[in-house]
């Protein structure tokens, strides 16, 4: 059995090698010759999977080691009788920790307390729900906007996007990209939305680039609108707008979900789905795959205030490590993808053991996702 995998899926060759011959290839553009004789294809978000790619091939299963699926024509796969699996939630923790890293940086720079802010979360799925729980653990007020869940009658208090526009100091987008239909998210943050934001707001997009109208955002910033912006995703990619890059506060190359744990979860989820598809179900214990973290343990004294939380969060992941390289090389062709392809290992907060003086501190840090204990 021939299994084609994206060369940037960690642990893919070792895991899928249990099931057949593995051929690792680049994801963008994916070499068509590699698909000849392939039985399965494992991709990331950089590869568009549709009839044009797979027609005439014998591929009978496609897996994407990503939470999002807008790069895959799932309707055509179903029509063609090709099995499919994504990895929902695989990188949700990493995206949440990216948002916190960015907010802590802005809070320190601009001199505000996060507890005094209201955070509006647009899209309350795997990422948004985890973000809401961690913000709540810190006593931060949240407003949730998720029309599909609201219409289903889910047991949450949901708000309209207009409510968030008026009331939220920080608005962060975590929706899929829907280009049509009743829950269209294409340019959800359009010129009218941006124009209606009160001064001093913070806008974060770590979901899909086209959820925010990048042309309208650039126009607003060029016109002098008082708006702080964090962008991890762009419209389009990989050819992002250099004028927009120059005007946003934090800019990164679509890596919010790129923790080592998140990538490994994506690979293991599609591996387990494919093994089940073959009738040979196998499970993987994630920690057994991961190397020791660069910093394994720290001790803190007293209850962690915002400054201490920032130090702990940035000890594991400081968003500036991705902002600086992107600004340095963005004008060069191919560098956006190169930064993603050669992304250095990044860990999640759970990799850091924090030794505390008291149970209250340990409980707070545990709720935030650290491995905290009293010692």
Curated annotation (Swiss-Prot):
It comes from the Bacteria. It is an enzyme of class 1 (oxidoreductase). Its EC number is 1.1.1.290. The active site is at 208, 237, 254 (proton donor). It catalyses: 4-phospho-D-erythronate + NAD(+) = (R)-3-hydroxy-2-oxo-4-phosphooxybutanoate + NADH + H(+). It is found in: Cytoplasm. One of its GO terms (cellular component) is cytosol. Belongs to the D-isomer specific 2-hydroxyacid dehydrogenase family. PdxB subfamily. Catalyzes the oxidation of erythronate-4-phosphate to 3-hydroxy-2-oxo-4-phosphonooxybutanoate. Homodimer. This is Erythronate-4-phosphate dehydrogenase. It comes from Edwardsiella ictaluri (strain 93-146).
